[in-house]
Amino acid sequence: MSPETVDLEMRLLAGEPIYVGDIPIKPLNLRQISQLGYSKFQQSINIISMTLDEMIESIDDFEIQARLKAEKHLYKVFDMYMLSNGMQELVLKSFNLLFQTENVIIDGELLDDMSVVIDGKYVINRDNFDDVVSMIQLQNNPEKSASDEDDYNPANELAKSIAEKLKRSKEIVEKSKALESDGDGLTIPDIISAVSAMSNSLNKLNIWDLTIYQLYDEFARLTKIDNYRLQIQASMWSPDIEIEHWSEPI
């Protein structure tokens, strides 16, 4: 793991802002997300997470769609958001929520010059939009960054490395789900309840200070500890069992 990746993971674990250039991307904690509404929160992330192919396929005019497919190499995802007033409005509302500010505007008239300006000083454009979205996904949406492997395209190697860890965390969650449920996916409330019940320091009162990244990391680690204990017990009857220590990287 590179020093840069370690630094990024430290900030994710600490719940601190991650910077894309001079833009601070601060994760919301569970309490803030609960107050906003988890579904609304996830919808805001999903809106800005569309791929270029998804954007083109969503266009009803087949002639325009065919032309955009032929010229796809000329465009970035940000350009597609800026081509439509309706999509511009959705992007503004998403950034309103995710950056917790009403001061979000579209600046510029020509496509190449258009940008989203937050609080009058933070500029998101076609050059850094992918990086901003990638970091928001890593902080707040492990389901997207870890499970949609074919569609998820991290904007840089640091994000890719952390996304791999999130994928492993998600796999641990899925294994636990397979053992304990009837096949329905674990929900965020399920994970919050499980962590607050298993943890020695977190409870129903203070768990809301965690970010989603911290919650998933805590759940994955607690699950590894539980699995380690089971492996130790099983090794008494079957010495061939390979024991993975709970402190091993997730």
Annotated model-derived regions:
Residues 234-250:
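Long, intrinsically disordered, low-complexity Ser/Thr/Pro-rich regulatory/activation regions
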Residues 38, 42-97, 126-129:
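Phosphate/adenylate-binding glycine loop and adjacent helical scaffold
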Residues 1-67, 137-231:
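An amphipathic, hydrophobic-aromatic interaction surface with interspersed Lys/Arg
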Residues 14-16, 21-24, 73, 112-114, ...:
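Generic structural motif recognizing short loop/turn segments at the entrances and edges of beta-strands
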